[in-house]
Amino acid sequence: MHIIFHPEDEMKKFINVYIKSDYDIVILRLSVIIIFMLFGTYKWFDFEVMALKPLISPTWLNILYIMFGVHGGSYFLGIVETITFLALSIGFFRPAAGILGDIIVIVTGLVTLSLLPQLGKVDSFVIKDVLLLGAGSVLLKYDLKNYLNIKN
């Protein structure tokens, strides 16, 4: 007895499994978690504190420096980013926590992009937030659907 392998059938199976799965959302959530975990952790180190200074000082976000000092402003951002990645992580199991994380991702993107007119230039620190707006919106829709289904 010969078993004939048909790669096109295997590909169709894979595609059907993928379409019916949540793999895309899991990958997206993990990607955003990693971004916020890295950037949130960096905010506690001098290299990041100093890298942020020329980006924040000439903008309205300078209020953080006025309130907390240069290091304190960076630490504040680190705390917000840590809360974000923790909420997104818990969101795997608790959609309400995911919703909180998603909203912070969107707000973070909006806040960072609002700095563009004052910075007068586009750099990677700011432009990544265009993608985060989209990712946060997709995750928010997913978590809202899950939250409402759990409540019904």
What is each of the regions a protein language model found here?
Residues 2-83, 87-152:
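Membrane-interface extramembranous regions
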